Amino acid sequence: SIGIISSNYFSNPSSKLKLIGITGTNGKTTIATLLYNLYNTAGLKAGLISTVINYIDGKEIGSTQTTPDSLTINKLLHQMVKEGIQYCFMEVSSHGIEQRRISGLEFAGGIFSNLTHDHLDYHNSFDQYRDVKKDFFDNLPNTAFSLVNKDDKNGKYMVQNTKSKIFTYGLKTYADYKIKILESSLEGMLLKINESEFWSNLSGKFNAYNLLAIFSTATILGMPFSETLQLMSMLKNVKGRFEYLRLNNITAIVDYAHTPDALKNIINSINEIKTNKESLITIIGCGGDRDKSKRPVMGDIASSLSSKVIFTSDNPRNESPETIIQDMVSGVKPLNSVKTISIANRKEAIKTACQLAKSNDIILIAGKGHEKFQEINNKKHLFDDYKVVKECLTKMN
């Protein structure tokens, strides 16, 4: 295959460093990026291959797809080996596995975060999507490790045929690595691993899972316990992932949540943290020309769990924004419909949320996260959720 040819052409760079692949529906970017940041801060030479950005020892190289093609990957890895990189953390998407973009790569470890409804427009069925992810673990060598989230029922399935050494992590079940949330606020969490407590700048239960995956990986790779905890307390949010801004007594959170599960996770995390006095205003859209079955589900989740919802455009691509919004609205239960409004223009939707917000309210802008563009009718328009909401809240004075 082209993967093996590419590997050979660059003289198998993946075998000359420790390549760790991270797969799952949610958490890939956070786990990969924060592992890279952790190792970088520790003074170890590390590389990152992710949706948001590629890094080689602190130098940035642009990125668009979760898993680039095999030629690009091997070229990046070859460059990393030349620069003396010891560890590379890489997001592995199901598209990347199925299109054999990672064939010929030698992984030192694989991490499974969770599996939920995502990319079903591409994979046809959940079972097919799950089996593609499992394929990654089936192909790990016996020199590698796999680390799976034991609280996800698919975790066990992922590693049932792997030759790698299996480790598990979880909050609920008995696992090799466990974490406990002691306190939680929008500013961060007080966590406990083994008998040691540490503070993290990350919020939300889903981030406790991400941090535990990071801790477990560092431990498996031989980093001392106290050093790992110290480095973990220094980690900051990844851009566009639970990105937090407080201006004029209003909190805005920008997050990439674009699957039903990710949306539910982030709203539940905010609801667990806030008192009953503040309202949560959620702004949400769904991408055009993509899996339509998730639209009513996301409409239902947003309207059931938020105080107010503004349905708007995400990346409508070649579909009519109004049609996409209608699909989302169709999932709203009658008793929740009073909480919802629809504003197709995303900038207007954000502006309206800022006007509706009272002191101490929380605005969640979901779906696009770190993205700098909005795709409308085959054209990319500059658009940054964080910048737009910051501008709106600043003007409110």
Predicted regions, residues:
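Adenine nucleotide phosphate-binding catalytic loops in nucleotide-utilizing enzymes
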Residues: 123-130, 134, 160-264
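Glycine/Thr-rich phosphate-binding loops of Rossmann-like dinucleotide-binding domains
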Residues: 2, 98-100, 120-121, 156-157, ...
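Cofactor-binding loop segments of dinucleotide-utilizing enzymes, especially the Rossmann-like FAD-
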Residues: 25, 51, 149, 171, ...
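Hydrophobic anchor at the start of a short beta-strand
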Residues: 46, 87-88, 166, 280, ...
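Phosphate-binding loop of NTP-binding sites
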Residues: 2-150, 154-163, 212, 218, ...
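ATP-dependent carboxylate-amine ligase
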Residues: 213-226, 230-240, 244-397
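Structural signal for short hydrophobic segments within the conserved structured cores
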Residues: 47, 167, 177, 196, ...
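Short acidic loop-to-helix transition motifs that present clustered carboxylates
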Residues: 94-97, 153, 173-175, 236-237, ...
